[in-house]
Amino acid sequence: MPSSDEQRAQLEAGIAALEAQRATLGNEMVEAMLGPAREKLAALESRSQSQQQRKQATVLFADVSGFTAMSETMDAEVVAGVMNELWAEVDRAVTDHEGRIDKHIGDEVMALWGADTAREDDPERAVRAALAMQAAVARFCETRGMTLAMRVGINTGPVVLGAMGTTAEFTAMGDAVNVASRLEHAAPVGGILIGHDTYSQVRGIFDVLPQDPLSIKGKAEPVRTYVVDRAKPRAFRMAPRGVEGVETGMNGRDAD
């Protein structure tokens, strides 16, 4: 049986061939013949979108503190324009670090690493993106005389990727996503809070401050958390082997 891609290619080729026969066969006949082919193509694409994948990903949530206060003193259209400009800068920090913008919800953004192409350093890229996002917000506020700050939560773990809900919106779901969202809400204003699963893959690369474990509904044990202070000038990735927490090896490389 042909694969989905092969079936799609065959249908698209057949549709193109029929389109080329309009002058000979006439629009009415071509449209009648195109109907079934288009329906099959639409069904194939819908089935493809509904397929879900399980992947290891790093999830980032961030929100802008001070947005509500700003909204109360400015016209709604002006606020929308300002936020669009700010999100353009923030989103660029994500994509510059090979992340994918999953969605914007009001003053919050969700981004993913590993959804499209998995990389060993996805957690590091996410944390570096978070630092770049905060720097972008600081520059934005400095040039406009505004007082805004961004808090960020980052977590790494298995997620389910696919088209979700009645709108078939492509997104990620799962425990790792829920934890990342909780980390964002628990993060200090202007801070980056990461879970232990992310920390275990970036230790030695960033200066971090251990925080109190975070209790999350539905999880048997509290999540160990860390506030990221900054990237180390020259970092070495600490590779845990054997027993977790015992760092017995390292791959030296500059933190570019």
Language-model segments: which ranges?
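Short linear X-Pro dipeptides
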Residues: Q51, M74, T167-A168, R241-D256
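Short amphipathic alpha-helical coiled-coil/interface segments
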Residues: I15, V30-L41
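Catalytic core of nucleotidyl cyclases, primarily class III adenylyl/guanylyl cyclases
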Residues: F61-A62, A93-R125, R139-D175, V223-Y226
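Catalytic/regulatory signature loops of cyclic-dinucleotide turnover enzymes
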Residues: C141, N155-T156, D175-H196
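Catalytic NTP-binding/metal-coordinating core of nucleotidyl cyclase/transferase enzymes
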Residues: S48-A129, A136
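Short amphipathic alpha-helical heptad-repeat segments
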Residues: P2-A17
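Charged, low-complexity interaction regions
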Residues: A20-M29
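Cytosolic regulatory/linker segments at or just downstream of nucleotide-handling modules
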Residues: V159, A186-E247, G252
